[in-house]
Amino acid sequence: MPPKKASGTGPKKGQKTRRREKKNVPHGAAHIKSTFNNTIVTITDPQGNVIAWASSGHVGFKGSRKSTPFAAQLAAENAARKAQEHGVRKVDVFVKGPGSGRETAIRSLQAAGLEVGAISDVTPQPHNGVRPPKRRRV
């Protein structure tokens, strides 16, 4: 009897594995989505294809620590390091959301060695959209 293969390891039968190819993109865009609970940093090429990403949760923080500026800093550094492997040197930054990690993430992108060009806030503004949640009583 042949030995059993562990379930969930490797590609399924008839499925091609996608090797991660090294893209050479000198200029890209960094999208920072900072919510009250998490910060997600995505670095894309000019067409919008994702080159690298990282989030506070992906870096290893859980619960309320994901929303801290330090977690956003580590996420931005992680994404910048991955993007630099693909040749990214200059980024335009697009910030979205009201979270606490906005400025910290931009600063850590600069500290990681990426040259930051334009910084723009693309937070969506409702034209009286959905009803907001009720006020907290603490």
Swiss-Prot record:
One of its GO terms (biological process) is translation. Keywords: Ribonucleoprotein, Ribosomal protein, RNA-binding, rRNA-binding. Pfam families: Ribosomal_S11. The keyword Magnesium does not apply. Residues 1-29, 117-138 are annotated as: Disordered. One of its GO terms (cellular component) is ribosome. GO terms for molecular function: rRNA binding; structural constituent of ribosome. Residues 13-22 have a biased composition (Basic residues). InterPro entries: Ribosomal_uS11, Ribosomal_uS11_bac-type, Ribosomal_uS11_CS, Ribosomal_uS11_sf. Part of the 30S ribosomal subunit. Interacts with proteins S7 and S18. Binds to IF-3. Belongs to the universal ribosomal protein uS11 family. Located on the platform of the 30S subunit, it bridges several disparate RNA helices of the 16S rRNA. Forms part of the Shine-Dalgarno cleft in the 70S ribosome. PANTHER family: 40S RIBOSOMAL PROTEIN S14/30S RIBOSOMAL PROTEIN S11. This is Small ribosomal subunit protein uS11.
